Curated annotation (Swiss-Prot):
Residues 272-283 have a biased composition (Polar residues). Pfam families: PK_Tyr_Ser-Thr (PF07714), WIF (PF02019). The gene is Ryk. It comes from Mus musculus. This is Tyrosine-protein kinase RYK. Glycans are attached at N123, N158, N162, N166, N193.
Length: 594
């Protein structure tokens, strides 16, 4: 794959730096070969280590990992580059450090807004020796409460070994949001009069009792009022099906990239240095919603009844070109005539079946077409209408996207010459991934599980806008992507998480796994994952820790995102909102080098 606008390895251009959240993930990876510069030291080395403990990282970031800045004299520039956001309610930071031989230190701070925050305080001296035993020092970051402002803090630590000329400077960047404190309410005249009456032994008890009574009543009323407002807001929020504006604006197509038509697929164990899985939040899915597949329990009459409210007359649909065709299913480019004004027309996709389709196949098409029904988001493509008239083959109508199926589009891009202006760049591919992650993040918030996320179940238009659609007819149109493992059900084995393969369990976490494979599809321009692996061996293969290898010219930071999605434990996979943030930051970093 030739590098487009992204400046990837092998392109000869500048390489974009990893975004902040990826820097943190990379900093927590197990150390491989010592590529980071070491502390200036004597030949034996002082063996200095400085890090945030697992408890401290969990308190600040919610991650179960230690964050090393220096490990046995090796400096982690990934970790030092991360500008850590300190929660506004957190006033203390704790650093763990030690050295095996004499190392002198000098500690200093810089704050960009002294009105919002005073100079940080520490419980150690400003200069001295790094302790020889494992020790913790505390940094206090207390706001003044005078203004609302984000404060940037720089902690500079100079480490000196053996002589004053032999030193290393470490800069730790932090930022914290400080808020203005509410002013205390001044005592009113009524309060003053009341304060004088409390010395009256006759009226003291009744007056205090009355005040407490009225205050209690007022507080109760206020609480009831607030609860009512909150319930009303939550109800309105759940009823509104608004499009969430959490995807970034589309980036334009630029200099193209092409990829060789063949690529030798390699597979790596998850614990090898080039395929290590970064640590992610263990609390990513506090309550996993697990579903079992029960489509075969629905009858054709029940399936038609569920879509009766969006049924339209067959006369309003005109079928044009056949876009895709399988054994029993077809997708047409269609025209939908407006019900009130026959002169108004809309272009549509029309999914339907051939005459030889069985009742089970028709039922499955209707049922799976309803997967995204009623959901509204710019990166989702739910059905809008159906035609279920007697004597006619059922039809499912969806909005039209003029570049069609994403998988077919990617494979077409692979055949395009490198100098073709319509070829897409790496930045465009990342932008597509962001859009898919945004749509899936919306589904996760609505507790909707897709079960079959893949490039084949997405569509794209000429502005490179991508939308996720259902998987109706996908088994028929992409038969090589589905396999039956002896249970009489065709499943997308190569896209499925281990718990889905073994226990037929699906959740938002299993959708995250499929997203990682979809991201791999994007970076390989539509290649098939695990193409050399027997579908019956996939579960054992994944259990042993093997994963698909890093695509050619795929940046390490982007492959780290994929690896996060393929953690065996569903709880350790990132949430879609975290993936949106990671990919958006990486997309911005690519754009900075265009």
């Amino acid at each position: 794959m030739r590098a487009g606008r992204g400046g990837v390895p092998g392109s000869g251009g500048l390489r974009a730096p990893p975004p902040p959240l990826l820097l943190l993930l990379l900093a927590m990876l197990p150390a491989a070969a010592p590529r980071s510069p070491a502390l200036a030291a004597a030949p034996a080395g002082p063996s200095v280590s400085l890090y945030l403990s697992e408890d401290e990282v969990r308190r600040l970031l919610g991650l179960d990992a230690e964050l090393y800045y220096v490990r046995n004299d090796l400096i982690s520039h990934y970790a030092l580059s991360f500008n850590l956001l300190v929660p506004s309610e957190t006033n203390f930071l704790h650093f763990t450090w030690h050295a095996k031989s004499k190392v002198e230190y000098k500690l200093g701070f810089q704050v960009d807004n002294f009105v919002a925050m005073g100079m940080p305080q520490v419980n150690i001296s400003a200069q001295g020796e790094v302790p020889r035993t494992l020790s913790v020092f505390r940094v206090e970051l207390s706001c003044t409460g005078k203004v609302d402002s984000e404060v940037m803090i720089l902690m500079q630590l100079n480490l000196t070994v053996n002589s004053s000329k032999n030193f290393t400077v470490l800069n730790f960047k932090r930022r914290k949001m400080c808020y203005k404190k509410l002013e205390e309410v001044k005592t009113s005249a009524l309060d003053k009069n009341t304060s004088r009456t409390i010395y009256d032994p006759v009226h003291a008890a009744p007056t205090t009792s009355t005040r407490v009574f009225y205050i209690s009543v007022g507080v109760c009323c206020a609480v009831i009022f607030l609860v009512a407002i909150i319930l009303a807001v939550l109800h309105l929020h759940s009823m509104k099906r608004i499009e969430l504006d959490d995807s970034i604006s589309a980036s334009s197509s630029s200099q193209g990239l092409s990829q060789p038509s063949t690529q030798t697929t390699q597979y790596l164990r998850a614990d090898t240095p080039n395929n290590a899985t970064p640590i992610t939040s263990s609390s990513g899915y506090p309550t996993l919603r697990i579903e079992k597949n029960d489509l075969r329990s629905v009858t054709l009459l029940e399936a038609k009844a569920k879509v009766k409210d969006i049924a339209i007359s067959r006369e309003r649909i005109t079928l044009k070109d056949v876009l895709q065709e399988g054994t029993f299913g077809r997708i047409f480019h269609g025209i939908l005539v407006d019900e009130k004004d026959p002169n108004k027309e809309k272009q549509t996709f029309v999914k339907t079946v051939k005459d030889q389709a069985s009742e089970v196949q028709v039922t499955m098409m209707l049922t799976e077409s309803c997967k995204l029904r009623g959901l509204h988001h710019r990166n989702l493509l739910p059905i809008t209408h159906v035609c279920i008239e007697e004597g006619e083959k059922p039809m499912v109508v969806l909005p039209y996207m003029n570049w069609g199926n994403l998988k077919l589009f990617l494979r077409q891009c692979k055949l395009v010459e490198a100098n073709n202006p319509q070829a897409i760049s790496q930045q465009d591919l990342v932008h597509m991934a962001i859009q898919i992650a945004c749509g899936m993040s919306y589904l996760a918030r609505r507790e909707v599980i897709h079960r079959d996320l893949a490039a084949r179940n997405c569509v794209i238009d000429d502005t490179l806008q991508v939308k996720i659609t259902d998987n109706a007819l996908s088994r028929d149109l992409f038969p090589m992507d589905y396999h039956c493992l002896g249970d009489n059900e065709n499943r997308p084995v190569r896209w499925m998480a281990l718990e889905s393969l073994v226990n037929n369990e699906f959740s938002s976490a299993s959708d995250v796994w499929a997203f990682g494979v979809t991201l791999w599809e994007l970076m390989t321009l539509g290649q098939t994952p695990y193409v050399d692996i027997d579908p019956f061996e996939m579960a054992a293969y994944l259990k042993d820790g093997y994963r698909i290898a890093q695509p050619i010219n795929c940046p390490d930071e982007l492959f780290a995102v994929m690896a996060c999605c393929w953690a065996l434990d569903p709880e350790e996979r990132p949430k879609f909102q975290q993936l949106v943030q990671c990919l958006t930051e990486f997309h911005a970093a690519l754009g900075a080098y265009v």
